[in-house]
């Protein structure tokens, strides 16, 4: 999985588990629908920490809890990569 898709996977998984549609998440998190759509579509490769924090709060999680998942924790960076 590409690094930029890790957050997309996390958001989609949490939405599915909690029965929350993306447009509802936008409202709950006070993140613009277009911003969230761009993240989920992979157009925004590196979402701002403030945006991720708002999304975490919408899921009733701390930012640390939101970022604590296997795909991110186990990610290995390519030595040649600037990601």
Spans of model-derived segments:
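A short, Lys/Arg-rich alpha-helix, primarily the initiator
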Residues: 1-21
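Short alpha-helical elements of helix-turn-helix
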Residues: 5-9, 33, 48-52
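Short alpha-helical DNA-recognition segment
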Residues: 19-39
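DNA major-groove recognition helix of helix-turn-helix/homeodomain DNA-binding modules
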Residues: 50-65
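Short, charged recognition helix plus adjacent turn
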Residues: 38, 45, 67-83
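The alpha-helix within a helix-turn-helix
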Residues: 15, 26, 56
């Amino acid at each position: 999985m590409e690094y930029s898709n890790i957050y997309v996977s996390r958001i989609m998984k949490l939405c599915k588990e909690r029965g929350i549609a993306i447009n509802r998440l936008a409202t709950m998190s006070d993140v613009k629908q277009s911003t969230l759509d761009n993240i989920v579509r992979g157009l925004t490769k590196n979402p701002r920490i403030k945006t991720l924090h708002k999304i975490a709060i919408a899921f009733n999680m701390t930012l640390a809890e939101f970022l604590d998942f296997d795909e991110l924790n186990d990610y290995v960076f390519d030595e040649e990569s600037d990601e």
